[in-house]
Regions:
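N-terminal helix-turn-helix DNA-binding core of bacterial DNA-binding proteins
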Residues: 1-41
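Short helix-coil-helix linker/hinge
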Residues: 10-16, 75, 100-102
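The N-cap/first-turn positions of alpha helices
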Residues: 14-18, 78, 93
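Short, conserved alpha-helical segments within structured domains
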Residues: 16-20, 70, 104
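Conserved SAM-binding loop
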Residues: 23, 74, 81
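Canonical helix-turn-helix DNA-binding module
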Residues: 27-72, 79
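Terminal interaction helix/tail motif
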Residues: 80-119
């Protein structure tokens, strides 16, 4: 994934940054909620968000419901990263489905989601 992003012009991203772009992505999330979802500390997430903000992938904006809080907003550049990631995942899923067959691939996907919930 990282290699593909670098090829597409996002050479300033590293593997740690990809954590933030995991499905469903950071758009509109509160940093504290995203940290829980990603199972990382708020401090670690804020460090990554700061880097991604400086690199122009996202902004932290005041929450319209609670001015004391912030929400994450992807910039155009951040939205492009999400698009590249989704395209790469779709291609990988198509390849795996072709190799395993649709039924076995569906089973694999179900098992992986189950494992992720218990991680």
């Amino acid at each position: 994934m990282l290699e593909r992003l670098h090829e597409q012009g996002f050479a300033d991203l590293d593997a740690a940054h990809l954590t933030v772009f995991q499905y469903p992505g950071p758009q509109g999330a509160r940093p504290s909620d995203l940290a829980v979802q990603l199972r990382i500390s708020r401090q670690a997430l804020n460090y990554l968000l700061g880097q991604l903000e400086r690199l122009g992938y996202l902004e932290r904006r005041a929450d319209t419901d609670d001015r004391r809080s912030k929400r994450i907003a992807l910039t155009h550049r951040g939205e492009l990263v999400v698009r590249v990631i989704r395209e790469a995942v779709a291609e990988l899923e198509t390849t795996w489905s072709r190799q395993l067959g649709p039924k076995r691939f569906a089973e694999l996907r179900t098992l992986l989601l189950e494992l992720n919930q218990h991680a």
